[in-house]
């Protein structure tokens, strides 16, 4: 299994609202079939940093990052149902390494500057996704807190609006301020 499959990015998340679509995870076969072009090493590089033809859904990315935050459980997402979770059997050291990186992103020197002074400590992932529109990017920001035992996680996406830390980060901060400091 690829890591994309293991983290649930190649299947629907099972959310109980209509209209869910699959993320697009490009492959050499997909590129040849859809674009009539061969796969180059540069395509692999772009895929590894979340660029190029990769198109993740908000709920798909949220669910995969939630599995890091909660210690390795990949859960169905839902509005009005209890989630069913599957243990991914990831090495605890690997989960902790990624989680530490996400905590670092929300700490001074990281990219999630809207959470540098937040208590309790949070972990986050910022993103600026290409759109194939001239100079337009989607702003992503995923965050969970408290970092040691998360009770809330949010993923904010603002389409065609700029950088995740600049645009979506402040919106996520408002949600977390309301949750932790009403």
Indicate where each model-derived feature is located.
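Short, gly/Ser/Thr-rich active-site loops of penicillin-recognizing serine hydrolases
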Residues: 86, 171-182
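Ordered, soluble secondary-structure elements with a strong preference for glycine-centered loop motifs
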Residues: 162-166
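Beta-lactam-recognizing serine transpeptidase/beta-lactamase-like catalytic domain environment
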Residues: 1-161
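Short amphipathic alpha-helical face segments that pack within enzyme cores
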Residues: 57-63, 167-174
């Amino acid at each position: 299994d690829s890591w994309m499959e293991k983290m649930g990015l190649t299947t629907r998340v099972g959310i109980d609202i209509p209209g869910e679509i699959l993320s697009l995870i490009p492959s050499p076969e997909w590129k040849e079939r859809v674009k009539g072009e061969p796969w180059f090493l540069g395509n692999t590089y772009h895929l590894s940093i979340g660029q190029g033809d990769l198109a993740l859904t908000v709920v798909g990315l949220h669910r995969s990052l939630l599995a890091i935050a909660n210690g390795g459980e990949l859960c169905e997402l839902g509005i009005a149902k209890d989630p069913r979770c599957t243990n991914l059997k990831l090495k605890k050291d690997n989960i902790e390494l990624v989680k530490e990186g996400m905590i670092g992103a929300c700490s001074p020197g990281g990219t999630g500057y809207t959470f540098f002074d937040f208590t309790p400590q949070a972990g986050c992932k910022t993103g600026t996704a290409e759109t194939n529109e001239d100079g337009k990017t989607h702003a992503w920001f995923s965050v969970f807190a408290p970092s040691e035992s998360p009770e809330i996680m949010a993923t904010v996406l603002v389409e065609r609006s700029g950088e995740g830390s600049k645009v979506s980060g402040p919106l996520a901060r408002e949600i977390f301020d309301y949750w932790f400091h009403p």
